[in-house]
């Protein structure tokens, strides 16, 4: 539900980035319901809804798909563990077959723009920062605050970064729309559109719990709550 405040307001993008980066620097771990949708090879894929646990050091991910089309699938990745491979299995009748795959293995990349190691708020913020700072340096960024919006029950402000249409291929997209949580200052959702206005990437973090008390057991395939 949006509550826009009329005309957009100019904002210092570097100052905004530093604020968001400082907020994330205070986060050691988090849990969320991760919403993901991507356009791959020109096709907008179905939305994915994933229970996500993330720890920053060592970088660790646990993902469980909780809605179709991949309901019941699980994935574990811990930097340096399992020969730096992800451990994963599909849901349904394939749940008993477990794979150990490089994050860039075609089996994991088939329906993804990025490897699984690029999952999470940290990568999201890093990607936004890289694109924005590149455009600042080139003097071709339009950055503004568009108003307020409630996302996943949280109050957010809407930021928009627009890159030149004729140079959209130099960036991850033509237009980024970012919802920043007002309380934590963490980006809660980002949508990326191409030069034709088509949605290319959409990521959101619902029920986000920052500095969640995660332990090694949360990233252990022997965890009795998991089905590896």
Regions found by a protein language model. Name each.
Residues 2-47, 53-59, 67-69, 140-144, ...:
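N-terminal leader/targeting segments and the immediate start of mature chains
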Residues 6, 12, 94-96, 181:
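N-terminal functional modules and adjacent low-complexity/disordered segments of proteins
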Residues 10-11, 39-41, 86-87, 106-228:
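Gly/Pro-enriched, hydrophobic low-complexity segments
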Residues 43, 50-123, 198-201:
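An acidic-aromatic
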């Amino acid at each position: 539900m949006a509550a826009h405040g009329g005309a957009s307001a100019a904002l210092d993008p570097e100052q905004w980035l530093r604020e968001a980066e400082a907020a994330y620097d205070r986060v050691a771990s988090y849990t969320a319901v991760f919403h993901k949708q991507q356009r791959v090879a020109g096709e907008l894929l179905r939305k994915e809804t994933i229970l996500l646990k993330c720890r920053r050091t060592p970088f660790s991910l646990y993902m469980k798909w909780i809605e179709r089309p991949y309901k019941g699938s699980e994935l574990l990745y811990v930097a340096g563990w399992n020969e730096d491979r992800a451990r994963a299995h599909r849901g349904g009748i394939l749940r008993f077959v477990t794979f150990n795959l490089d994050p860039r293995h075609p089996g994991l990349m088939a329906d993804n723009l990025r490897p699984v190691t690029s999952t999470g708020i940290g990568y999201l913020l890093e990607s936004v920062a890289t694109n924005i700072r590149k455009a600042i340096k080139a003097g071709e960024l339009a950055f503004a605050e568009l108003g307020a919006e409630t996302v996943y029950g949280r109050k957010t402000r809407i930021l928009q970064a627009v890159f030149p249409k004729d140079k959209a291929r130099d960036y991850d997209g033509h237009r980024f729309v970012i919802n920043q949580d007002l309380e934590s200052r963490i980006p809660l959702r980002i949508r990326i559109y191409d030069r034709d206005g088509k949605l290319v990437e959409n990521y959101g973090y619902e029920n986000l719990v920052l500095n969640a008390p995660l332990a090694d057991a949360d990233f252990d395939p022997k965890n009795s709550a998991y089905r590896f």
